[in-house]
Every structure is written in C-alpha cells, then in structure tokens.
Regions:
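Conserved substrate/cofactor phosphate-moiety recognition/catalytic segment
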Residues: 20, 24-65
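Glycine-rich phosphate-binding loop used to anchor ATP phosphates in small-molecule kinases
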Residues: 51-98
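A glycine- and Lys/Arg-enriched "phosphate-lid" helix/loop adjacent to the NTP-binding pocket
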Residues: 89, 94-139
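Walker A/P-loop
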Residues: 16
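Walker A (P-loop) ATP-phosphate-binding motif of ABC ATPase nucleotide-binding domains
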Residues: 4
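ATP-binding Walker
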Residues: 13
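P-loop (Walker A) phosphate-binding loop of NTP-binding proteins
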Residues: 10
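Hydrophobic anchor at the beta1->P-loop junction of P-loop NTPases
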Residues: 7
C-alpha cells in the first residue's frame, strides 16, 4: 500500500491549493473532491450536473487503486470505513470564516464574472452556495 494524505478544511480554507502544492512536491497524484462530484460536462456552469455520493465514492476508490501515492483534498473526506485505511496522514486547515467567505466569493467571481452578480444568470445559484458555505459548522 502506498501513502495517502488527506487535506481537510471548509470551503475557502485553501485545501485544494495546499493539496496541489503538496502533491507536486512529493510527486503524488492529486485528487480533488470537487472533481469527483462535478464532472466537467457544462462549460458554462461546471456545477450543473453533480454526481451522487455513491458515484463520487466509486470514483475515489478507482483513483486510489490506480494511484497508490496520492493527496486528496476534501472538506471532510467522509467516505466510510472502507476508505480510511488508505489515509496515512491528515492535514486539517482552519481558517477564519470571514477570510474563507471572501475567498469563496472571489473564486466565484474569477470563474463566472458578472454572471454571479445581481442580475446575472448564476446569481441565485451562487448566493445559495454562499449561504450554505457560511452555515457550515466549523468543527
């Protein structure tokens, strides 16, 4: 069995950024939970067709089997007892909510521009996401 590292943190904490850098430094494969859930099927809105939990879990299992040395970025990584043995190391990133929310909104604007602002076609969807992110428990 190789080495699996999970980088956890709430939305906007920097887990993907840190995970990618760590994977590059260690020459490990990088897996982002967001990529498991959201296939790049719609160039206009990449979150349009989310996969189910089971589909994402199966994809993660596949990635782990193919790439035994990996870094996995996920809010919690809660994929059950079957996955836990593949993680040898855990990194938990804790960032203040105001900083995280600023990063999440900034990232949304970078991806979607004016489409996520009032009057834009993605405004309602993104605002719902911001409310969800802000409501997440910090423990």
């Amino acid at each position: 069995m190789g080495t699996g590292i999970i980088v956890c943190g709430l939305n906007g904490s920097g887990k993907s950024t840190l995970g990618k850098a760590l994977a590059k430094r260690l020459d490990f494969y990088f897996i982002d939970n967001e990529d498991l859930y959201f296939p790049k099927m719609d160039n206009q809105y990449p979150y349009a067709s989310p996969r189910t939990y089971e589909e994402a879990k199966n994809l993660l299992f596949h990635e782990i089997k193919v790439h035994e040395n990996f870094v996995f970025a996920s809010v919690k990584g809660n994929y059950g007892k079957e996955i836990s043995p593949f993680f040898q190391l855990v990194v938990l990133i804790d960032v203040a909510k105001d900083v995280r929310m600023q990063r999440v909104r900034s990232r949304s604007f970078q991806k979607f521009g004016n489409r996520m602002l009032p009057g834009g076609d993605l405004y309602d969807q993104e605002e719902k996401f911001f409310v969800f992110v802000e409501s997440r428990a910090e423990n």
